[in-house]
Amino acid sequence: DLEIEYQQAARDALVEAGIAPSRVRMISGSASAVLPKMNDGSYDLVLVDADAANVIEYVEHGLRIARSGGTVAVARALQHGRVADPAKRDEVTSAYRALITEVAASDAVVSSLSTAGDGLLLLTKRGI
């Protein structure tokens, strides 16, 4: 995240949940600059909650850096209900719709879509 106060709020929530700070790595920077530099297969959980127009690129990076059995969580996957409305054809909505369709057909991940709130897409990377 680019916002230091959001990172601090996340750290506080993790401590409150009993998760040791050493178990989490938070990186400040734009996803487009940071993700390409991250090591393959090194993370248990990757949260994609960034520039919606580039969601597919970020998920691809997320799957690359997630270990086998790791999860990529995609926030706002339903885009305020726009994904379910076939009349909505803007670039962002179409990207999320394509992402959901693609991962549903993929053998590389086990996917689950929660329709609660604005939607959360969970992609668990299958072992190789």
What are the functions of these language-model segments?
Residues D1-I128:
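S-adenosylmethionine/decaboxylated-SAM
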